[in-house]
Amino acid sequence: MGVWHGRSLRKPTGGRIRPHRKKRKFEMGNPPTETLVGEERKLKERRGMGGNVKKGLKFATHANVADPETGEVKCVRIEEVVKNPASQYYERHGVITKGAIIRTEIGLAKVTNRPGQEPVVNAVLIKEEEEEG
């Protein structure tokens, strides 16, 4: 079944609202692109308004991790998702979202962008104590 972002056909009281027009294509939605840690990087393309193509990351292998102390940004391999405050389900299944804490080759990092909406994973290096507290 498709995702539809149009107005509900029911009033708060439960009564029916008679639609004045049919559903339109621009009211359509998409299920979320749940970015996972994978063996090979894979993108998911969606059609946007005006024929625009939106690219989201389906499987991620590497992340651009910034070190706030030195200011350096390194492209490092993602090992696993340690914590995801967005959802227990996402944490259990290893889904990467904004705010998720991932383990990389150089340490723990917090994701700062939305990989389901952008084709990269950007993160900031955090100390081990910050994650536990």
UniProtKB/Swiss-Prot annotation:
Q: Where is this region: Disordered?
A: 1-34
- Taking the record's annotation, the residue ranges forming a coiled coil are none
Q: What keywords are assigned to this protein?
A: Ribonucleoprotein, Ribosomal protein
Pull one GO CC term from this UniProt entry. Answer: ribonucleoprotein complex
Please provide an example of a Pfam family that matches this protein in its UniProt record. Answer: Ribosomal_S8e
Spell out the molecular function terms from Gene Ontology. structural constituent of ribosome
The family line of this record is:
Belongs to the eukaryotic ribosomal protein eS8 family.
Q: What is this protein called?
A: Small ribosomal subunit protein eS8
Q: Which organism is it from?
A: Methanopyrus kandleri (strain AV19 / DSM 6324 / JCM 9639 / NBRC 100938)
What gene codes for this chain?
Answer: rps8e
